Amino acid sequence: MLNKTFSNLIDSIRLLFRKDKESYLCFYRMLGFYPRDIRFYEQALLHKSFSVKLEQGGLLNNERLEFLGDAILDAVVGDIVYQNFEGKREGFMTNTRSKIVSRESLNHVAEQIGLSKLIKFTIRNSAHNSNLGGNAFEALIGAIYLDRGYAYCKYFMENRIIGQYIDLKKISRKEVNFKSKL
């Protein structure tokens, strides 16, 4: 895998010549690396209620990135759980992954990393706003994947999220009755 320190050095040099430095720096502080194509990350912040109409028709918002990010997040977290809980059974690992990628957990992480404050939306109904952060976090993972690939998604989750905001050992012991949530 590409040395992230060297890669960030190259990206920070490129940043010197950019007009939109502040956006890049904002995402760098959140992610731990510079985006290459900032458009993915900006799109991750666009809630459906704040959609942008495209010239060729259609709307631009974070829903497609959220879909992709959900799938990638399941794979990345599954990978991390598999590596950290050697010898554990499939049911244990599935439950642990489910707790990490739960809407409650993702909403909390989005709040902690400052993502929730950056989301662009127009809905003022609090019932609709309750999952904005978690949905945007999934979209952010989709943006990272399209911009940098699976390895950076895993790097971000391992180095910026797990440990700082999610305690693997603690969450694996947390009792959750998934059937009662249905």
Annotate each predicted stretch with a short phrase.
Residues 1-182:
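Double-stranded RNA-binding/processing signature
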